[in-house]
Design a protein with these regions (language model features):
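Interfacial loop-to-helix junctions that mark the boundaries of transmembrane helices
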Residues: 1-7, 108-121, 174-179, 285, ...
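Short helix-coil transition sites and intra-membrane helix breaks within transmembrane domains
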Residues: 24-28, 56-65, 165-166, 194-203, ...
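Helix-loop-helix hairpins and the membrane-proximal interhelical loops
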Residues: 1-46, 146-193, 211-214
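Hydrophobic alpha-helical transmembrane segments of multi-pass integral membrane proteins
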Residues: 43-69, 184-207
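Membrane-interface alpha-helices at helix entry/exit sites of multi-pass transporters
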Residues: 78-90, 216-225, 247-257
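Cytosolic, long alpha-helical scaffolding segments
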Residues: 79, 105, 217, 243-249, ...
Length: 578
């Protein structure tokens, strides 16, 4: 082997790693979001979690990416630790798909089918197909094209590496190196170190398959190296869990314990068999498909051994990392960006909490208009601060999420949530304004006349009903509620004008001061604007256009086109008559 063979091997390695990287990236975009949502929904039992983890890892071709996703889900509360254990075991089996694809380079046989299945036959076809798909304007087709180009690139890199190391078969140093790796402990450490450095067990196994093409890697050397690769792949999840919640760190630790225990047990069995039986099979050169067989068999044996003991693994990490999380884990973890559907589900869950806080604050603000309770006022302010923080966190995350490659449906959901959280925050602001108006009435010792109190109660009851209608529509994702909300919102607009005119008339008759008139005007404005935001919420749920002008134009059109709209208005006008 000369310097040019060395450069070819290095170039092949670079192509291999680059191809695997862009293929995994495209597959994560193509399937990660949808499968991420399934990962959230299909983990109710340990077996379901196992098969879901297997499917997700096989689809994105990266156990490291799947584990980062799991850590993010546990950190965000989308998965419990118990659910994560089954998923983690599934990711180990799912990662065995890649070596089987790479073993196509070791196929032999003549004829058209045999030649087509070898890299020299299918790589040009995949490259052509990939380029055509990549030039498409459709995002999903572009991702498919990138995945095909990535696979073609990694197979070309694999061929280049295999051809370059073929000359190593006669190199004495290379033979001595792999003779040393027949020591199980050295092989285990070598596999773990290589995988930890490149942070991909699939890539590490691929490199081993390329070296196996030299004919100098024996079965006895390959087995402990593959065991070590399973340990080295844990580094990605461990690094990902740094700074995460205690439960997320436990999930990463389960992954490490699972692979350490499996490797330890089967390495001991391998060593005993090697010493006592010394089978000649261990001295035979391993083929590319042989590496895939060993990798698959080892991961299946580990799962068979430890799946029944999954509860013990969970209890072990609870003892190693005792205690409870001081606070709820990071509400929106950046790891969720790899699974847009699950990320949107979490965003919607938090938006629901935000809506509930805004509704509770509106109730407290209305109550403060007649009597300010210090404890209630303190809680309203605390919840208002939380609503503001949630809007900042959700808004920032949704903007980042919108920058990812999303399906049309997910993109629409992200835009809807961005609009909704703004309305929830403004609803909370108006509740805060009502509290301040109540405090102003108290501090200035202004009392509302009985007639004003009666009329105000009618308006606040209408506003509380429209808030319930709008927020229930959001929770149930019910677009039909928009018609009821629009009718009630029109009645509230009329009530506001009636109450404003009546207060002016009473002031002209000497009932109430100018200060009362100013506060009264502020209260009516806040209640009317709160109703407007409820109308916006129902409009968003109904899928009306974004933006104030588009939304209001669509609402006006609906009022004109709905033959039952006037009947609804009359019904609410009768209910809330002053």
């Amino acid at each position: 082997m000369d310097i040019f063979d060395g450069l070819s091997a290095l170039g092949g390695l670079c192509l291999f790693l680059f191809g695997m990287s862009i293929m995994a990236e495209a597959l994560q975009r193509r399937a990660g979001g949808r499968l991420g949502g399934q990962l959230r929904r299909m983990t109710r039992s340990r077996w379901a979690g196992f098969f879901t983890g297997l499917a997700v890892t096989a689809a994105v071709q990266s156990s490291s990416a799947a584990m980062v996703m799991v850590v993010g889900f546990v950190n965000s509360g989308l998965l419990t630790l118990g659910q994560a254990v089954g998923v983690i075991m599934g990711t180990n089996v799912g990662t065995t798909v890649t070596p089987w694809l790479l073993s196509l380079g070791g196929l032999e046989g003549g004829g058209f089918p045999g030649r087509l299945l070898r890299p020299a036959g299918f790589v040009p076809l995949l490259s052509l197909w990939g380029i055509i798909a990549y030039l498409s304007r459709n995002g999903r087709r572009r991702d498919t094209g990138q995945a095909l180009l990535g696979f073609a690139t990694l197979m070309q890199g694999m061929e280049l590496m295999s051809g370059s190391v073929a000359g190593l078969a006669q190199a004495e140093g290379f033979r001595r190196l792999f003779t040393a790796f027949t020591d199980p402990l050295l092989g285990l450490l070598a596999g773990a170190l290589l995988t930890a450095v490149i942070q991909s067990s699939s890539a590490s196994v691929g490199i081993l398959q390329a070296l196996a093409a030299s004919g100098q890697v024996t079965v006895g050397a390959a087995v402990p190296i593959i065991m070590g690769q399973n340990i080295g792949t844990c580094i990605t999840a461990m690094l990902s869990s740094v700074g995460a919640s205690r439960n997320a760190r436990r999930a990463a630790l389960v992954h490490l314990l699972f692979n350490l225990t499996g490797a330890g047990v089967w390495l001991a069995v391998f060593w005993v068999v090697k010493v006592l039986a010394a089978p000649t099979m261990l001295a035979r050169p391993v083929t590319l498909p042989g590496v895939a067989v060993i990798h698959t068999a080892f991961n299946l044996l580990c799962t068979m051994l430890l799946f029944p003991a999954a509860g013990l693994l969970e209890r072990a990490v609870l003892r190693l990392l005792p205690g409870e999380d001081g606070e709820k884990g990071t509400e929106l973890d950046s790891r969720l960006l790899a699974a847009p559907s699950a990320a949107l589900e979490k965003c919607r869950e938090l938006a629901g909490e935000m809506a509930a806080l805004a509704r509770d604050n509106l109730r407290r603000g209305v109550a403060a208009l007649t009597e300010v309770q210090p404890a209630s006022a303190k809680e309203l302010r605390r919840q208002e601060e939380r609503i503001d923080r949630m809007e900042d966190v959700l808004g920032t995350f949704l903007v980042r999420l919108s920058g990812q490659t999303l399906t049309r449906r997910d993109n629409a959901r992200a835009a809807e949530l961005l609009a909704l959280i703004g309305d929830f925050e403004r609803l909370g602001d108006h509740a805060m304004n009502l509290l301040e108006s109540g405090e102003e009435l108290r501090d200035k010792d202004i009392s509302l006349p009985a007639e004003d109190r009666r009329e105000l109660r009618v308006l606040t009851d209408a506003v509380e009903e429209i808030a319930d209608l709008a927020l229930d529509a959001f929770r149930r994702e019910d677009p039909a509620a928009q018609a009821e909300v629009e009718a009630l919102e029109q009645v509230i607009d009329g009530l506001k004008e009636q109450l404003r005119s009546r207060r002016i008339r009473r002031m002209q008759q000497g009932s109430g001061t100018m200060e009362l008139g100013f506060v009264w005007s502020d209260v009516l404005t806040d209640l009317e604007r709160a109703a407007d935001h409820c109308s916006n919420i129902a409009g968003c749920v109904a899928g009306l256009p974004d933006g104030n002008q588009g939304l209001h134009a669509a609402q006006t059109a609906l009022r004109q086109q709905d033959p039952a709209f006037e009947d609804r208005v009359r019904r609410y006008a009768e209910k809330y008559r002053v």
